[in-house]
Amino acid sequence: MQRWDTKGVFPPFWPFYCNFGKIHWMRKIQMVDTKNQYLAIKEEVDQAIQNVLDTAAYINGKAVQDFSKNLGEYLGIEYVVPCANGTDALQIAMMALDLQPGDEVITPSFTYIATTEVVALLKLTPVFVDVDPVTYCMDIESLKKAITPKTKAIVPVHLYGHAAPMEAILDIAKQHNLYVIEDNAQAIGADYTFSDGTVKKTGTMGHIGATSFYPSKNLGAFGDGGAIFSNDKVLADKMAMIANHGQSARYYHDVVGCNSRLDSIQAAILNIKLAKLDTYNKARQAVAAYYTQAFAGIDAIVTPAISNYSSHVFHQYTIQLKGVDREKFIAHLAAKEIPCMIYYPVPGHLQKMFASKQQHQWDLKVTDQLTPCVCSLPIHTEMDEVQLKYITEGVQSFFNSKG
């Protein structure tokens, strides 16, 4: 059955809110709606799961091999190593590069903690850099200032669905002989356009790309999952070994590894959803366009920008609130049963886990400015126009009441 009508990407209206005496039926608004996304592809997913159950090949079965192959073809990259989750993907990537305790790894502070958590876990030294106030991705000038003789790797994060400035990052990495690991957990399917017109998928430009298939992601499993990818066969083979107890052959362990596998059921589900990823991303882009148009006349809202070098797949629709009490804004929406989230309320350099490094005078002005004012609105593939109208009117009513 066709999920969306032929005139647009929004699904048909569902079941309520009252507006000018009219009742509009509406589903409960959620930040993420994995249930209805599943229901839209239920037959395909159920059959894929049943196929795995019928073969009983639960670990590294055909579904895993098929998904790895299909993901590689989609991304345009040679080697894909599936693993248990996105955090493992980052950890395995760093382990494969033979980084040593005390080596410095540069990451943005304004991101989810997993990016930096694995750096500390491996006894490497995290070096926090600032982000661009428009894209929320790694700031190039801040990156340049952070490089020292101890720097060994850069981990740019394609935050919220927008690509980091990879061309400049790769140039800097080449100049200083540094590794680049792309954290692509929030931007799978996004395109990056180089100055010469070359287009590549995010996650495929550095030495290694890492992603997460957490259920809320643009390409989400029905549990945990992740993957690492590279065009370097030596690195790919080593990452595959590390992900499987460091084994080169069964019971022969060449390197210290871990146990990090994507199971066949999750791979089978992801294989179904991978074929729909571009459609899912277009649905998110349509939601974002609706929001941006609705908020165009509100000076206190800074809507997400899209750079000329990057598409945006809107894992999150994150706004900045200028001169506004964010807690009052959130409470106003909550009273209307409109959820919103703060990604992220505490940046990496201020987390308690890095308390010993907080004596360092980090020059992260943009990060410090963004943290108190960002707010993310609901965005997912199953939103309909009734919900979007209700959300945007709810946001607008907050600013109308202030006037």
Stretches found by the model and what they are:
Residues K35, V64-N70, Y74-V80, E141, ...:
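PLP-dependent aminotransferase class I/II
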Residues F10-F20:
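Aromatic (phenylalanine/tyrosine) cluster motif
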Residues A56-E104, V118-L122, F128-D130, S195:
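Phosphate-binding glycine-rich loop
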Residues M95-D191:
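PLP-dependent aminotransferase-like
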